[in-house]
Amino acid sequence: MEHWGEPIPRTGQSWRQPLSTSGRGWLGSAPWRWLGPASWRWLGPASWRWLGSAPWWWLGTATWWWRLGSRWYPRSMEQTQ
């Protein structure tokens, strides 16, 4: 864990190889461990429901605000002119 404080290796220094191997191993393993069996429970039916509902809810609110804005904003622009 001592390589965390080191800068990104750009020169051929002595700590470059352990940093790159451990860093690559950590970067290679951690996301897959994070996306592994433990998070399949997180990516299970509950989150598929969330992934199915949240974007549509966001798009629904965005289109609702856009309709509200497009309905009232041009009317106010016509009044100002």
UniProtKB/Swiss-Prot annotation:
It is a single-pass membrane protein. Residues 1-22 are annotated as: Disordered. It is found in: Mitochondrion outer membrane. GO terms for cellular component: mitochondrial outer membrane. The keyword Mitochondrion applies. The chain crosses the membrane at residues 50-66. Residues 11-22 have a biased composition (Polar residues). Keywords: Membrane, Mitochondrion, Mitochondrion outer membrane, Transmembrane, Transmembrane helix. It comes from the Eukaryota. The keyword Chaperone does not apply. This protein is produced by a bicistronic gene which also produces the major prion protein/PRNP from an overlapping reading frame. This is Alternative prion protein. It comes from Bos taurus (Bovine).
